[in-house]
Amino acid sequence: MELGHVLSEGKTKIVYAHPTDPDLAILFHKDGITAGDGARRHVIAGKGALAGQTTANVFRFLNRAGIATHFIEAPEPKLTVVRRCVMIPLEVVMRRLPAGSYLRRYPEAAGQRFDPPLVEFFLKDDARHDPQITPDEIVAQGIATPAEVEQMTMTGQQVFTTLEAAWAKLDVTLVDLKIEFGRAGDGSLLVADVIDNDSWRIWPGGDPNRMLDKQVYRNAQVVDEDVLADVYARYAQVAELTGRWDAVTK
């Protein structure tokens, strides 16, 4: 597919203008994988295609569930055509179980279950390690309106429970999930960016020792070719499993 000029580039993707439609953009999924705000980084051949396939599977599923997203189509595994948005510089994190940074902040929360899913906001700022930010601070800093904060909270929980139910059909526990939002040209708020295997914690059978997500890369003391091959295999399995959601949820 023909690509327009580069609009932006991040650690794991490049955003291109659409060659003929100014209301669309094209995401190119790179083969890079990073952790620690980019302090650890490697290239895994084929990872971008798996990320693109997973993102397409997830967004198609959300669209069919009636959730407004920027996803249009995935003409190639590494390319995603989306509605062009102005991104809100926030990570919106939903948690069913305490894990990761939440447990480091609140170790006493171990063993809890959040119902409804807990929603947290983090400012996208690598230099400051994506600090947590409150809804009041989001509004005070002009990042989003009170109505948008409420919509991101409600939609975030809806996205989580929708994907949680799909994963449950495959006996996989969705522990937590990170998403982003953007404003489309008409001002509407859309679930945007990507949702791939870097975006969540997923535990088959509820067992963290069987994790399929990026945490296995974060946890590795030393990253060698065997670790990267293991990461690739897990990402390939997730791309395949998310492709089965439609069949198992009918």
Curated annotation (Swiss-Prot):
Q: Which domain of life is it from?
A: Bacteria
EC number(s): the record gives 6.3.2.6
Q: What class of enzyme is it?
A: ligase
SUPFAM superfamilies cross-referenced by the UniProt entry: SAICAR synthase-like
Could you tell me the keywords of this UniProt record?
Answer: ATP-binding, Ligase, Nucleotide-binding, Purine biosynthesis
Among the GO biological process terms of this entry, one is: 'de novo' IMP biosynthetic process
Among InterPro entries, the record links this protein to:
SAICAR_synt/ADE2_N, SAICAR_synthetase, SAICAR_synthetase_CS
Its UniProt pathway annotation is: Purine metabolism; IMP biosynthesis via de novo pathway; 5-amino-1-(5-phospho-D-ribosyl)imidazole-4-carboxamide from 5-amino-1-(5-phospho-D-ribosyl)imidazole-4-carboxylate: step 1/2
Q: Which reaction does it catalyse?
A: 5-amino-1-(5-phospho-D-ribosyl)imidazole-4-carboxylate + L-aspartate + ATP = (2S)-2-[5-amino-1-(5-phospho-beta-D-ribosyl)imidazole-4-carboxamido]succinate + ADP + phosphate + 2 H(+)
Gene3D superfamilies, alphabetically?
ATP-grasp fold, B domain (3.30.470.20), Phosphorylase Kinase, domain 1 (3.30.200.20)
What one GO molecular function would you report for this record? phosphoribosylaminoimidazolesuccinocarboxamide synthase activity
Which Pfam families does UniProt cross-reference here?
A: SAICAR_synt
Which family is it part of? Answer: Belongs to the SAICAR synthetase family.
State the protein's name: Phosphoribosylaminoimidazole-succinocarboxamide synthase
Q: Which organism is it from?
A: Chloroflexus aggregans (strain MD-66 / DSM 9485)
* UniProt lineage: Bacteria, Bacillati, Chloroflexota, Chloroflexia, Chloroflexales
